[in-house]
Amino acid sequence: MTLGGLVTHTTAPFRAEYDTVVVGAGPAGLMAALKAAARGPVLVLEAASLPRNKSCGGMLNEYAQEFLAEIAPVPPSMVRAPEHVNFRYVDWDRSIRKPTSLRFLNVDRREFDDWLVSLLPANVDVVGSSPVRGFTQDREGVTLTVRVDGTEHAVRCNNLVGADGARSTVRRTLGEGSVSTYVTLQDFCKLEGELEPYFDCIYMRDIGDSYAYSYIVPKGEWGLVGSVYYPKTSRPHEKQDQTMRIIRSALPQLGETVKREASVALHVRSASDIVPGRGRVLLVGEAGGFMSPTSGEGISYAMNSGAAAGAAIASSAPDDALAAYSSGVDHIASNIRRKLRWLPFMESAWGKYLAGFVPTPIVSKVTEGL
């Protein structure tokens, strides 16, 4: 199978040596590959099959849109109706709704990742269904063990980029430890009427302490209802059923659930969760701890950190790439540290209660920084 002329699955051994290997074919990994290809051949390994399916609301904020404007025009074919939605804070129990000026481009996430693959140059190979089993570093480079169709292969590279998400194998193999993760569930509901053109972020109090928030977004003929639960939540599917009953009671236009997806998302709680890498290994996106701890937005963080890693590789000697990358993402790390200071208040019952009394223009302004 090919996408954009690139290898996406193979039963034969691929090349034994690449200049750069990227683990993970999401926005972080693909942007790293795009930039790193300026130095030499790149291999992108994705544990899942391709085209990749990521459980996500598919919302591109203004930072993500600005980033992509410098790469390539977003194809209209992957944009869903309504084309743009604004973020809206919803205190469900008190019927408080506060629309903001934060505006998102509404895309199909599966098609978005597929499109990013098509942007890669000819010296990048993308191979799906190829989980990495481990790797070792030495003074000359990195050697990975990759499993494809039941057979293990060794691949050698000068630099390795870990872009394999919140449960990163690359991060764990480095000995940096895992970052805790939210449990996320997302229902695809057949629409039986129109939803308002908002990306609603919902707080409610009847689900229990394990519940963080829900979101609703219209997506063409579908209504997506996602919920985020804190780490170690027991029986999350039962809690999502309860959440869906409450939401449907007020929004009957949300028809039957046709599909439910389960996934995890990074749960950043400390500046120590941010790890750019070690040696010749660079960590990007959620693997490196790059994600908003206050809003849960990750796509813009993924693309920017991935591009910074790829640019550092392209412009540096292999031994110097990590230092260049760390410098290049220092402003992103500072942004996350600033948001972490707000987090205890935002997650507290008092914080959520007081937000209902804050004038809407102030909520809108604060939201821009989250």
Regions found by a protein language model. Give the residues of each.
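Extreme N-terminal leader/targeting segments of oxidoreductases
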Residues: 1-20, 39-40
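Short beta-strand to alpha-helix junction loop
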Residues: 98-118, 231-241
